[in-house]
Amino acid sequence: RQDTHPYADYDFMSRWCKEVNDEYPYFNIVGETWLNSNVLVSFWQKDSKLAAPRNSNLKTVMDFPLMEHMNKAFDEETSDWSGGLYRLYDYLTQDLVYADPMNLLTFLDNHDTSRFTTNDEKAQNLTRFKQAVTFLLTTRGIPQIYYGTEILMTGDKSEGDGMLRKD
């Protein structure tokens, strides 16, 4: 995992990714691309048409926009076309912006964000949890489960990073 990938020099990181992958073709570098738009995230993925003629050579980027949509979608109960699971449908129909949607790292939470089960109320909603994990494990991309998510650990980013990383 390459932390804060877009903050580093583009040309250096592109060359670094290419050289590592040339030497170790089965090694995968995941770039933390914490951006709130699929278009912005897709710019950083290897072979992105949005970055042409440049190429980041970064095969796997983190799908932060999907994380946000999942956290909202499984909290909203609506029968209209503006929220709930429609959020996921709408977002996934835009996968054409990615060079390779199957190489996106997908996740419900991580060490920098509030946990999916932010508080005890959300942790007790097992239907919400099961639906979200099922979606995560069956949608396109490479699923990642942050330690503690599987046992419904709680943690709110507003209480500090220590609350997200407790043992």
Residue ranges of predicted features:
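Conserved interdomain hinge at the start of the Helicase C-terminal
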Residues: 129-131
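Active-site-proximal helices and loops of the catalytic beta/alpha 8
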Residues: 4-99, 104, 125-126, 135-138, ...
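Short, solvent-exposed helix-loop connector elements
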Residues: 117-122
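FAD cofactor-binding and catalytic pocket of flavoenzymes
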Residues: 133, 145
